[in-house]
Amino acid sequence: MSISRRSILSSAALAAFPIAGAAKDPKTGMPLRPLGKTGVMVSALAFGAGSRWLAYKDPQKAMEALDLALKSGINYVDSAASYGDGQSETWIGEYLKSHKKNFFLVTKITPRGADEAKRQIERSLKNFGLSQVDLMHIHSLGGEDDLAKVEAADGILKVIQQMKEQKVARFIGVTCHTNPKVLATFLGRHDLDSTQMALNIAQIGNAAPSDKAGQGLTGASGFEAVAMPVALKKKMGLTAMKVFAQEKLLGKAAPNVLVRYAMSLPVSAAVVGMPKLEYVEDNIKTAKSFTPLSKEEMQKLPASVSAQMRASIDRFFADHVDC
């Protein structure tokens, strides 16, 4: 069934959208959702292995957090070559030296040129101690100029397509922080398995970095309205990131409500960074007891974020890649 943009423009409509094929892990009680049409079931809560994981500083504490997450039913681990200049991947590689790989491993590749991208992929595999990752994303698609670099004959898109053909990556995709229109264009043009976008109560993706006033911004030009419908229509895996907007949304709603907002969208998983063990425990409890927010709540929460705050968050992410 195709999904029109109009039918899911509002958060209320999104909240009512059923997650087809959703289930629960019988051993852990963790909710599982299909990653698009890949045939893979992933935990609705994913472990973000970016700056919030690296905040543990002590590798042993970081391993403890990862181990707790995995034993509690989280099976999607989200890393990137740029996180700590490879430190995130290296920590995961250290974990895998003494643990069986029983989770879905994701990394992201940044360079736009083919040669540099291939070198980074080689380094990532070495960091993990693996010959294959489950999902390889093009990291942080930007504006039109960046799109042209990605799609160039000697660009990164060709490289990750080759990685899938060579079984270095089981699946491929792209992430985007601030450019819903560009992301929608890219998703529409290419046959990808997955995409990750910034989804939170601020409904960001509306303001250009130069938009200092932040006037007239609405969710109608954000990721939910512009890019999400394309991913859903193509039955791609869809993951939410920046659920807390780097903690900028804390205070607008309780942490568990922010997680529930993301999980109430038609996503495969909400990727959350958890810099303390108690945060891991709290978010696991939220996921296992998850009930969707009501249509009214899904409308009220974005309305609580001012246009100025939304613009500020947009500008922040326009210049920021979690590292």
Q: Across the structure, where does each feature detected by a protein language model lie?
A:
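N-terminal secretory signal peptides and thylakoid transit peptides that target proteins
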Residues: 1-15
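C-terminal segment of N-terminal export signals and the immediately downstream linker at the start
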Residues: 19-45
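Glycine-rich, proline-tolerant flexible connector loops at the mouths of alpha/beta enzymes
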Residues: 78-95
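Glycine/proline-rich, positively charged
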Residues: 112-239
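Structured C-terminal cap/extension of enzyme domains
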Residues: 214-216, 222-323
